[in-house]
Amino acid sequence: MCFATRRWFYLHLGCMMLINLVNADFEFQKGVLASISPGITKDIDLQCWKACSLTLIDLKELKIEHNVDAFWNFMLFLQKSQRPGHYNVFLNIAQDFWDMYVDCLLSRSHGMGRRQVMPPKYNFPQKITGGNLNVYLRE
């Protein structure tokens, strides 16, 4: 008898959980994704953050001001929008940003990015090919 009542209880519990899942408010999840822990902000590499933000404005050809604040205000607008298409665009841009940001951090930590950030010590000629001529320029 105990087995039957336990089974009946779990059946009701499972049905209630399914009903709650169907009626769930996913706006709460958007709010959780938007919150940034204060401890995380000091760990952000601002140079990579700014470079990736500005690069995404150019790559995605966004019709916003060409600065970091405008980009992130636009991202917040997309995230908090009630239109599902806006949230999908937000997720795509956020994924692209994250990929670029991680690549930037890895290249800087391995020294590849430092070569671009620091001023050049030596002035090596760069080869520019134009037609059949090979021209060497010093910048």
From Swiss-Prot:
GO terms for cellular component: extracellular region. Residues 1-24 form the signal peptide. Residues 113-139 form a propeptide. It comes from the Eukaryota. It is found in: Secreted. The active form requires C-terminal amidation and disulfide bond formation. The modification Methionine amide is found at M112. Keywords: Amidation, Secreted, Signal. May be capable of activating GPR83 via the GNAQ signaling pathway. This is Protein FAM237B. It comes from Homo sapiens (Human). The lineage of its organism: Eukaryota, Metazoa, Chordata, Craniata, Vertebrata.
